[in-house]
């Protein structure tokens, strides 16, 4: 992003002159208090909104609109109830063309990777909330996007399922080399997932914190001192700009 500004009519800028670069293959988390502009920034990164000034670039090209190089996952899985799991995963392909054998193979590989191979012919109503979120993740990755955008995707899940989904997301994106932008209110989630954490306040990115924890990440590290020092650092950054 280069000097990106976005304003809703009659309001101060929601995104106010942001310069931000994400390295390919990294996991970037975006945190900040409610109303600071996180979701608007995500929509700009997705091409769902166009900035009034500045540019959003993806792989060196100015982003004009959403395309197959982008994957999306939001808080509600929004699966099609009348379609089987495999067809829900293939939906981004079906919107562009008739799925071929390679598309189906890729979809089945994602379901297998996420522990859902035996559910390919089931309907969403037959799945738990966590399983539905895994289907939504597979759907977001089926076109092998360069950038995956997620807005509070696990917020409605219980703590155990949420932790499992965090591990699934990390493992799957690492294996595929996918660049991720993940919006969350949860500092501990951001520290667990992120290579970098951007702190947003009043439409600006006010801090960009590099997280250097040993990998692969496991849930037990949440109880260790280095993890909690990073959590305290992010919290201090958020508290400092809000004071």
Model-derived features: where do they sit?
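Helix-to-loop junction immediately C-terminal to a conserved catalytic motif
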Residues: 46
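Conserved signature/switch motifs of ABC ATPase nucleotide-binding domains
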Residues: 122-125, 143
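Hydrophobic anchor residue at the start of the ABC signature
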Residues: 137
